[in-house]
Amino acid sequence: PRSTLFPYTTLFRSLARMEQLRDEAAHGGKQAVLCGDFNIAHTPLDIKNAKANETHAGFLPEERAYVDKWLGELEFVDVMRDLAGNIQGPYTWWSQRGRAFDNNVGWRIDYQFATPELAETACGFVIDKAPTYDLRWSDHAPLSIMYDI
């Protein structure tokens, strides 16, 4: 499946611009963090039902390859995963269907990708998941990362 409104080639073209911005920051002695909703679960650890979602948008091989490029060629660090280690989740998004939120059947699709030097200063993270479905204000939970800089 491909989006006609925002084809994957557009995603991959944006990598060249991000590489340019990263290099400009590095030449200026600066570090960078890119954060937000990527709408892509990168690995099976980032999605509750990986096998069942392998053919669904948000967990397609070409989408995950896009994140691979951020963490490989562009040398950014997935800061939350680096801090949390190889554990299932924690998730930042839950479908509004069924009881996904209540049963913690989620996806981790919100990220903070940092340059390696900045990532090394990360000292903790919080995913501010509402205590109950009724108290949440979005289908996402904010990801906050603390940096000791």
What is the meaning of each model-derived region?
Residues 1-10:
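Single conserved hydrophobic/aromatic residue that forms the stacking wall/gate
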Residues 14, 18, 34, 63-66:
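Amphipathic alpha-helical interface surfaces
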